[in-house]
A protein has these predicted regions:
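Transmembrane alpha-helices
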Residues: 41, 78, 85-88, 96, ...
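Generic alpha-helical transmembrane segments of integral inner-membrane proteins
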Residues: 6, 10, 14-22, 45, ...
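Periplasmic/extracellular loop-to-transmembrane helix junction in inner-membrane transport proteins
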Residues: 1-14, 164-169
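Transmembrane-helix boundary motif in ABC transporter permease subunits
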Residues: 11-39, 52, 56, 60, ...
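Membrane-interfacial helix termini and adjacent extracytoplasmic/periplasmic loops
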Residues: 30-33, 48-78, 111, 147-151
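Interhelical loop and adjacent transmembrane-helix boundary motif
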Residues: 138, 144-200
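Short hydrophobic faces within alpha-helices
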Residues: 2, 41, 98-106, 174
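Membrane-embedded alpha-helices of multi-pass transport/permease systems
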Residues: 18-22, 52, 71, 78-99, ...
Length: 202
């Protein structure tokens, strides 16, 4: 149960970090402003709408993932990506251009500039973004309920099913799972907060 919970949330976090980090670098450089509005869409629509849309989008070739174990973390990552981007973009934009220019003058390639200047300075915000993504994935319900497999429900869905079933034992299991979820989420948030960037200045 806990292993499956961690794997699903972990995969969703990795997807959200890869896509979100690339989008954040593009937005910070000003080369992909059109992405900004698109990345806000998951925040502007309900999770139910997002999950239903994903169910339709991934239900036919060539992206037929219905019933695939990958569909749940993909949908959860869609919910988390905007938070990753919004966490990393301000830090990337605050990096002084003169630092990048100095590295380029010294002969650094664009990739070396990113690796030696941007990555170290944005590392703390990346950890915070990953923590947010993981916490969001742990508790996501609205979108996940549309795509989760019946034999592999996520914890929030399992809690919902137990609460909808009569019997004191089902209620007790729901409460126990909810308590575990709260503890895990609180732990992730507290650990993440230690890496929070206190202030971004130019």
């Amino acid at each position: 149960f806990l292993t499956l919970l961690g794997i699903v949330a972990g995969v969703a976090t990795v997807i959200a970090m890869v896509v979100g980090s690339l989008a954040a670098f593009a937005l910070a450089s000003g080369s992909a402003r059109v992405l900004s509005g698109a990345l806000l869409l998951p925040l502007g629509v309900s999770a139910v709408t997002l999950g239903f849309g994903a169910l339709i989008a991934f239900d036919s070739a060539p992206l037929n993932l219905r019933g695939s174990p990958w569909l749940v973390p993909i949908v959860q990552s869609l919910v988390a990506i905007p938070f990753v981007v919004r966490t990393m973009v301000p830090v990337l934009r605050a990096i002084r251009v003169s630092l990048r220019e100095a590295a380029a003058v010294l002969g650094a390639s664009p990739w070396q500039v990113v690796r030696t200047i941007d990555v170290p300075l944005v590392a703390r915000s990346a950890v915070v973004a990953a923590g947010f993504a993981f916490a969001i994935s742990l508790g996501e319900f609205g979108a996940t309920v549309f795509v989760a497999r019946g034999d592999h429900p996520t914890v929030p869905i399992a809690i919902y099913r137990f609460l909808g079933s009569p019997g004191a034992s089902n209620q007790g299991q729901a409460m126990a799972m909810a308590a575990i979820l709260v503890v895990l989420t609180a732990t992730v948030v507290l650990i993440t907060d230690r890496f929070r960037v206190p202030e971004v200045s130019s």
